């Protein structure tokens, strides 16, 4: 299953963000 890009809603399946963290139901990239 594909992971979510930053800015993608992740409230239902958190932890699928691509090199990002699920924060406030949205994938937030921590790759600055």
Swiss-Prot record:
GO molecular function term, any single one: toxin activity
Keywords, ordered alphabetically: Disulfide bond, Hydroxylation, Ion channel impairing toxin, Knottin, Neurotoxin, Presynaptic neurotoxin, Secreted, Toxin, Voltage-gated sodium channel impairing toxin
Disulfide-bonded cysteines: 3-18, 10-22, 17-27
Record flagged with keyword Secreted: yes
Function of the protein: Delta-conotoxins bind to site 6 of voltage-gated sodium channels (Nav) and inhibit the inactivation process.
Residue(s) carrying 4-hydroxyproline: 14
Entry note about domains: The presence of a 'disulfide through disulfide knot' structurally defines this protein as a knottin.
Lineage: Eukaryota, Metazoa, Spiralia, Lophotrochozoa, Mollusca
Subcellular location as annotated: Secreted
GO (cellular component) term, any one: host cell presynaptic membrane
Entry keyword annotation includes Disulfide bond: yes
Domain of life: Eukaryota
Name used for this protein in its record: Delta-conotoxin-like MVID
Primary residence: secreted
Family: Belongs to the conotoxin O1 superfamily.
Tissue expression from the record: Expressed by the venom duct.
Entry-linked InterPro entries: Conotoxin_d-typ_CS (IPR012322), Conotoxin_omega-typ_CS (IPR012321)
């Amino acid at each position: 299953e594909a992971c979510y890009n930053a800015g993608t809603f992740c409230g239902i399946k958190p932890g699928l963000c691509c090199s990002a963290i699920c924060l406030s139901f949205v994938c937030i990239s921590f790759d600055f």
